[in-house]
From Swiss-Prot:
The modification Lysine amide is found at residue 167. Residues 113-132 are annotated as: Disordered. It is found in: Secreted. GO terms for molecular function: neuropeptide hormone activity; peptide hormone receptor binding; pituitary adenylate cyclase activating polypeptide activity. Transmembrane segments: none annotated. This is Glucagon family neuropeptides. Gene3D superfamilies: 6.10.250.590. It comes from Clarias macrocephalus (Bighead catfish).
Amino acid sequence: MAKSSRATLALLIYGILMRYSQCTPIGMGFPNMRLDNDVFGDEGNSLSELSYEPDTMSARSRPALPEDAYTLYYPPERRAETHADGLLDRALRDILVQLSARKYLHSLTAVRVGEEEEDEEDSEPLSKRHSDGIFTDSYSRYRKQMAVKKYLAAVLGRRYRQRFRNKGRRLVVPSVWTGIRDTVIITPEKRGKRY
């Protein structure tokens, strides 16, 4: 661990020093070239007849860089093209992000509901699965109620069955004489009795 951190620190310091030595004029010194009007040949003799004019030297000097690098890489006649391309790229990127987000959310909801990863064509929509689940729950609840009723009918015998049969025939009739609502059961053996 200590060797790793030392090596990382040394690499970081080396990188910083190299960056500043190449980027600043103070760091790395360039070879000093003095071009005076006196030009010397191979033997060391003065060649004054070959003097360099400042006009010819300006061609060799470093070109002045524009302050904005954008103008260097994209000339004014191509800026409209690149701007339109950038807008199109940004719009396409936004659309792709939305599509991938929808697909990701769909996969999350499918996993929560209990569906395994399937193809888009084979999977049912979530609303259909939801309605199927509601129907299954309602049907299973109905089956349980019928099983309980059947059990009670078997245990309680005839009395429960008779009461269950008459449940649909009970009527709520207001009594004219008392002004109170009474329940009247209409069956062949109990005609007109009040409960």
